[in-house]
Each structure stands twice: as C-alpha cells, then as structure tokens.
C-alpha cells in the first residue's frame, strides 16, 4: 500500500481492486494525474471522471448539498456498488472534465481501496477495462494491458472483486421543486433494492 500511496502523491496512476472490478485511480486534484488517467484509459481529453471517496463525511465535503434521499441511499449502500451524481461544491479546486458542475461519487466496499482512500483522500477513477469490453480481473492481464501507463497494481489478494458495474443514480434534479431522482444505470444493486430505501415515486 505504501507504494500505491507514494505513486498517487507523485501524480501517477494506480490500479486498485474494488468490490465491482479493478479501477484506475489518480489524485482528483492533480490535473497532470488526471490527464495520465485519461490517457491510460484512452479517453478523450475532457471526458468526465468519477470519484472514489473514503466515507460519507467526504460526500458532504464534496457535494454542494446532500439531499435526504442521497443521504439515505449512501447510508444504506455504502460502502458498496452505488454511485450517486450530485452537484459538486463550487469551491473545489479540481477539473474532472465536462461534468457540467456535477460529480459522480462512490465509496467502494473493498478493504484495499478504502485503506488507500483513507490515506490519500478522494481519488478520480475509471474502470480498468476498455469501453465495450469485460473488466479485467487478473493482475497479470492488468499489467499487460496497462504496463506503460500504470505505476502500481494492487492485487486483490483475499478481497473479492468481480466483473459487475455499480448502480448509478442521478440526484442533480433534486435542487428544483419538482425534481426527481433518475436511475442512470442499474448494476449490482437492483432498482427493487433502491426502492426499499427511497420510494419509487421519487424517481423519474
């Protein structure tokens, strides 16, 4: 973990396991590191990046506001395979790409990921796989795929990681009187599980 932490501090890209799949991460507040992350994933220059965070208190620090529905979902499903899109705090000194003032946040349910996040703070992230392809789960395959663009690959060890995707919920419309949540992508957490926490009529 020390090598991963040091690499992040130097503005490098690191590959870490999560509860859904391996992810490439970099310092969310370092524009050079973000460029390296996009290059590793072969993304366009302004492609938006999402953010891993170490806990719910960081959600409150990064979001302009946290609607009660988002707080309820985070309390129930974090750490876990839930990504929430909220309005980003206006004073944050970062540039995550063409996000229109929003940020996608998740607290992964993986000991290795959370240990790193507890030491580094929020990390920009993108899945360690090419668009349209299945996530890579072997450190050997990851090393071969990202050998020229990733400084450290943290093996999952006895931590479970898979090939699933997180469920993504957009809460950015809740700042208007008639605004509703929207399920952008149904992944590892089903809509039925979501509706047990927040009633279905709160969704568009």
What do the predicted segments below correspond to?
Residues 1-204:
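Active-site-adjacent structural elements in enzyme catalytic cores
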């Amino acid at each position: 973990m020390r090598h991963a932490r040091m690499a992040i501090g130097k503005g490098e890209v690191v590959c870490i396991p999560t509860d859904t799949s391996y992810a490439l991460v970099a310092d969310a507040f370092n524009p050079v590191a973000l460029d390296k992350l996009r290059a590793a994933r072969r993304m366009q220059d302004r492609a938006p990046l999402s953010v891993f965070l170490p806990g719910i208190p960081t959600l409150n620090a990064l979001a302009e506001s946290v609607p009660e529905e988002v707080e309820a979902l985070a309390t129930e499903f974090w750490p876990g395979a839930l990504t929430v899109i909220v309005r980003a705090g206006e004073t944050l000194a970062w540039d995550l790409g063409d996000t229109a003032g929003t940020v996608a946040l998740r607290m992964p349910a993986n000991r290795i990921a959370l240990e790193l996040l507890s030491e580094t703070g929020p990390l920009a992230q993108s899945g360690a796989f090419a668009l349209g392809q299945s996530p890579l789960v072997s450190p050997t395959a990851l090393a071969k795929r990202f050998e020229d663009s990733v400084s450290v690959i943290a093996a999952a060890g006895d931590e479970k990681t898979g090939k699933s995707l997180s469920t993504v919920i957009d809460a950015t419309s809740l700042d208007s009187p008639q605004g509703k949540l929207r399920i952008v992508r149904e992944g590892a957490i089903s809509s039925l599980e979501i509706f047990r926490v927040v009633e279905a009529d709160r969704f568009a």
